[in-house]
Amino acid sequence: MLKEYIEKGGQRLRLGYTTGSCAAAAAKAAVLMLFTGQEVRHVRLMTPRGIELILDIGEIRMQKRTGESSSLFSCEDIEGSCKNGKTVNKPPFYSAVSCGVRKDSGDDPDITNGALICATAALSDRPGIRIDGGEGVGRVTKPGLDQPVGSAAINSTPRRMIETAVREAMEAAEACGEYGLEVTISVPRGRELAAQTFNPKLGIRGGISILGTSGIVEPMSDQALLDTIRTEISVRHSEGMTILAAAPGNYGKNFFLEKYDFSIETAVTASNFIYDTVQMASEAGFTRMFFVGHIGKLVKVAGGIKNTHSQYGDHRMEILGQIAEETAGSREAVPLTLKQELSDCVSTDEAIRILKKYSLDKQVLHEMTNRIQLVMEGWTKGKMRVEVIVFSNVFGELGKTAKAEAWISELRYETGRRGGSPAGGEPGSWKQGWEI
């Protein structure tokens, strides 16, 4: 168990390690056993973050070589770069060795926590180290991801970690010479786990991804979630989508399905990172974004708030009160206590009831929706047009901008063109975890 901690929100949270670290450690152990014939129960792995891991190795399986001996011979017999005449094993003791490492996500709510990540190291007639995915590791079917179409969903950093670990193992085992190795990463429950991740939506089929840029899982990492959002945006752009649909979460997608009988399965899940999502969409080359969200989050955007998480402040009622005051003007029917009444509200639905009481709901919500649009477009300095729909779970659709309906028609067409489901289907899924 990794005993490294961070302080976040007044809590002491334990770090974990990524699927990439597990794969690299398993590969290192498998190669050590392949060339030494000795069981390996623990390996050391230095992560890109600079934290050294000592990981337990299990599920060891060895396949013996047939018809060959494991004789020892001198380094002088090898054309290559062995160390000063040391005696080395040739040929290797086994033709293939597989083993596994259990993923430990620390205090992070990760789908893959406890999953067994396996590596099989096998001799090959071709020189070099080749890394591929086996059962339970996804296969890339769409452009725009870290790996090209057809490749195993083992991202760049884990691939480098695996190759480095394999070379370290060969050096430690004094395995000199031109050995070819096939390293296959597999996850026994990967196909089942993948159904609970974003992978099906991203076009990664058949299993989970092997992820991580630092080798370490940081509980509730903002950066990991931002990386996922950026990846989703990149995939949508590569698919040729001209309008990027986005929503803070599944509430928005579910509302859209119920209201318009249309599943925006291509919608990027922005979570609380509204500003970052808008910026990344613009940077990716999108010039149009369609955003649907609950008033509880989007009213904050109307006030210019970039991250809608409560840790950055609430301000919902203050913003609604300001808009109501500016919209109502000097109407006699509106009491001077309106802002205070709104300020006393606990929920936005309660605030809407107050606005309805004074027949201000339509005006205020219309103005709020337009301000959301203006703020989002302002974030891109006019490089991207944004259409918005705001809803409430109690009151339904509260407001939409001028061209929202027209863009919905375009989204229907684009979703149908890419082979999606314009109606029905699951509106979204959860990400694999906050691996960074």
Summary of predicted features, one role per range:
Residues 2-6, 14, 202, 208, ...:
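A structural signal for small-residue-enriched, beta-sheet-centric alpha/beta enzyme cores
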Residues 1-67, 73, 77-196, 200:
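Generic N-terminal targeting/processing segments that precede catalytic cores or assembly contacts
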Residues 65, 427, 432:
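Cationic, low-complexity basic patches in intrinsically disordered or flexible, solvent-exposed regions
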Residues 69, 74-79, 418-428:
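Ser/Thr/Pro/Gly-rich low-complexity, intrinsically disordered segments
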Residues 369-420, 430-436:
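Extended hydrophobic packing segments that form well-structured cores
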Residues 192, 253, 395-397:
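Flexible, glycine-rich phosphate/dinucleotide-binding loops
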